Amino acid sequence: MINAQAFGMALFQLSEEEKKVKKVYDQSHDFLKLARNFKDGSLAALLNAYTLTKKEKLKLIDKLFKNHFCDLFVDFLKTIVLKGYFNLVEQALKYFFDCVENEKHVQFIRIITAFELSAPQLKRIVAAMEKKLNSKIVYKTEIDKSLISGIRIESSAQLFEKNIRDQLSRLMEQFKGN
């Protein structure tokens, strides 16, 4: 029986060999974000479909991802599709994240704000996260104007969120509950 860990470990080992761990790590997050934007898992359904030949699936992967992801990551996607296990891709990537973070004793995080942070602000946030996670932090910043104000910090295992969009969402849930 094939499991997601085997795919995740293979991706980790290859990315280490090619010295592309950070790049593949970032692209894996980008891919998961993209895949989750497809309605009702339609990307997974398409790449697992029996109506498409393997050759058609490989062409589709190239067309969708070749210009946006490194060859190593695209080849990973092709392999998992060729083996017929695209439904395991999310689990495989989560295992890959765990391998990277455990092996490198580092946590990769995304700091998402509604506006650009100053260097001192970033320094304070990173120091606080290193203390909270008891790990060295490597970060990537993103701007998401839909947050309105506040911050969202994502790691592979945790989410820290303090922003108006989240607060409004919780408030709406309370109203629906009444």
From Swiss-Prot:
It is found in: Cell membrane. The keyword RNA-binding does not apply. Keywords: ATP synthesis, Cell membrane, CF(1), Hydrogen ion transport, Ion transport, Membrane, Transport. It is a peripheral membrane protein. One of its GO terms (molecular function) is proton-transporting ATP synthase activity, rotational mechanism. One of its GO terms (cellular component) is plasma membrane. InterPro entries: ATP_synth_OSCP/delta_N_sf (IPR026015), ATPase_OSCP/d_CS (IPR020781), ATPase_OSCP/dsu (IPR000711). It holds the Pfam family OSCP. Its main location: membrane. F-type ATPases have 2 components, F(1) - the catalytic core - and F(0) - the membrane proton channel. F(1) has five subunits: alpha(3), beta(3), gamma(1), delta(1), epsilon(1). F(0) has three main subunits: a(1), b(2) and c(10-14). The alpha and beta chains form an alternating ring which encloses part of the gamma chain. F(1) is attached to F(0) by a central stalk formed by the gamma and epsilon chains, while a peripheral stalk is formed by the delta and b chains. Belongs to the ATPase delta chain family. HAMAP family: ATP_synth_delta_bact. F(1)F(0) ATP synthase produces ATP from ADP in the presence of a proton or sodium gradient. F-type ATPases consist of two structural domains, F(1) containing the extramembraneous catalytic core and F(0) containing the membrane proton channel, linked together by a central stalk and a peripheral stalk. During catalysis, ATP synthesis in the catalytic domain of F(1) is coupled via a rotary mechanism of the central stalk subunits to proton translocation. This protein is part of the stalk that links CF(0) to CF(1). It either transmits conformational changes from CF(0) to CF(1) or is implicated in proton conduction. PANTHER family: ATP SYNTHASE DELTA CHAIN. This is ATP synthase subunit delta. The gene is atpH.
